């Protein structure tokens, strides 16, 4: 048998042209183009480019094709897009969380802002303040026990570089049963992505937080009396992220994500409290038994490792790690796994915990039963973490995902039984989250 192979020409990318973007600047769409002039042409990257464009909120449809370039082995890339005319969103809703109380929710989001695109005349308002790829987000979350109000702005091309710049500010109020806690907080960060898919990034930020602890009851913990009044915290944050994952509204994420975070506060950073804190998280999810993401069975494994230590004095209780409740450790009441002073949780400086869960669609993708196993320990110091004190919990529940009048309504119901606990813990068989942003 003789095989004859006729090898096609090897092409390189020539020019990349973008058409159809009457509102959005070219550089905003070019960040999604996986092909660069001068590099070898790979056909799979044409589809990658199209998929990335379709993930942008400002793109309604996209086509990517090759045409003959200036040389015999040169292929130009033509990108044709159709823009959405209105992409800003206003969300209004509410929800509840076992232990954290009920909340209202108002969110305004504009993912394609341009602060420097001012109207050129009194009638030029259709494209004003649009097309720059900047992001503005406002969130108002008033609640019965916890309230948060924040604003966030992101410039993805800081001074036309590959760095993004973000600034965040807001206030928060928390009712901790035996005392109250207020925050006025601001943060700024510069982030560098190391690949065009925005999978690996390194961010350097600075956080300032004015904290007030007040309205202490007689039985409030001693740690709360130690920090009563106003305290100013200021510290840099270094954060390394890896995210090789996609997400489906009904069935959740697929792939791998990891986070390494380091905070260091002290006199030199402008903080009234000295401490060092590190956090590492890992999450991996895989789908099975279906080609359509929303119909897949999903196995998820996650783990978190936290350490902090004060320099000369304990870390304030409002900066410590807490576990318990449906968001962090179902089977235990909200924040009530781990160290307590009387009836009030005071958190810990050493945290190790993880989860394994398995979910699948039941008749419809909106309804997903799941089984869950939780494990972990929270102690006053990392050196006190012990497998003999590991808490474990097992159970199941329902993930419900609905769209009502265009509004996404997620709800999670947990029936989880603690298998191993300590005397200071507060167990909880049923817990739930309901509403937006849970």
Regions found by a protein language model. Give the residues of each.
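Outer-membrane beta-barrel channels and translocator barrels
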Residues: 59, 99-101, 113-115, 131-133, ...
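Solvent-exposed, non-transmembrane alpha-helical starts
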Residues: 11-15, 162, 199-201, 249-250
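Periplasmic polypeptide-binding modules associated with outer-membrane biogenesis and secretion
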Residues: 1-97, 110, 118-155, 181-184, ...
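C-terminal outer-membrane beta-barrel translocator/porin domains of Gram-negative envelope proteins
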Residues: 55, 70, 77, 86-101, ...
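Transmembrane beta-barrel wall of Gram-negative outer-membrane proteins
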Residues: 142-230
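One face of beta-strands
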Residues: 62, 77, 90-92, 102-106, ...
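Outer-membrane beta-barrel proteins
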Residues: 140-143, 172-183, 265-274, 419-422
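C-terminal structured "cap/appendage" subdomains that terminate the fold
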Residues: 378, 385-405, 409-411, 415
């Amino acid at each position: 048998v003789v095989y004859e192979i006729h090898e096609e020409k090897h092409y390189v990318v020539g020019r990349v042209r973008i058409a159809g973007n009457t509102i959005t600047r070219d550089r905003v769409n070019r960040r999604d183009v996986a092909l660069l002039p001068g590099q070898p042409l790979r056909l799979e990257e044409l589809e990658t480019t199209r998929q990335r464009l379709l993930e942008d909120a400002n793109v309604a449809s996209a086509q990517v094709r090759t045409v003959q370039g200036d040389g015999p082995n040169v292929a130009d890339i033509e990108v044709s897009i159709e823009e959405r005319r209105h992409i800003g969103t206003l969300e209004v809703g509410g929800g509840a969380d076992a232990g954290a109380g009920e909340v209202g929710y108002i969110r305004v989001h504009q993912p394609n802002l341009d602060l420097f695109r001012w109207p050129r005349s009194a009638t030029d308002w259709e494209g004003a303040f649009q097309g720059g790829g900047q992001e503005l987000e406002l969130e108002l979350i008033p609640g019965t026990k916890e309230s948060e109000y924040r604003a966030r702005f992101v410039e993805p091309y800081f001074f036309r570089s590959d760095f993004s710049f973000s600034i965040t500010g807001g206030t928060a109020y928390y009712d901790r049963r035996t005392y109250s806690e207020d925050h006025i907080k601001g943060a700024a960060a510069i982030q560098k992505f190391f690949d065009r898919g925005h999978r690996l990034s390194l961010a350097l930020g600075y956080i300032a937080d004015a904290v007030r602890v007040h309205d202490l009851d007689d039985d409030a913990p001693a740690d709360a009396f130690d920090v009563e009044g106003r305290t100013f915290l200021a510290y840099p944050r270094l954060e390394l992220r890896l995210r090789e994952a996609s997400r489906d509204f009904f069935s959740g994420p697929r792939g791998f994500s990891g986070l390494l975070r380091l905070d260091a506060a002290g006199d030199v950073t402008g903080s009234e409290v000295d401490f060092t804190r590190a956090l590492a998280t890992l999450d991996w999810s895989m789908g099975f038994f279906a080609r359509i993401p929303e119909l897949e069975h999903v196995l998820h494994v996650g783990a978190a490792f936290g350490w902090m230590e004060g320099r000369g004095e304990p870390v304030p209780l409002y900066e410590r790690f807490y576990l318990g409740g449906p968001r962090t450790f179902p089977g235990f009441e909200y924040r009530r796994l781990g160290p307590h002073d009387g009836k009030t949780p005071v958190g810990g400086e050493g945290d190790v915990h993880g989860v394994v869960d398995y979910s699948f669609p039941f008749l419809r993708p909106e309804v997903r039963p799941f089984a869950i196993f939780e494990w972990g320990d929270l102690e006053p110091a990392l050196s006190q973490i012990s497998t003999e004190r590991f808490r474990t919990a097992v159970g199941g529940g329902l993930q419900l995902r609905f769209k009502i009048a265009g509004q996404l309504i997620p709800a999670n119901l947990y029936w989880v039984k603690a298998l191993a606990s300590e005397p200071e813990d507060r167990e909880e068989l049923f817990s739930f989250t309901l509403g937006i942003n849970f």
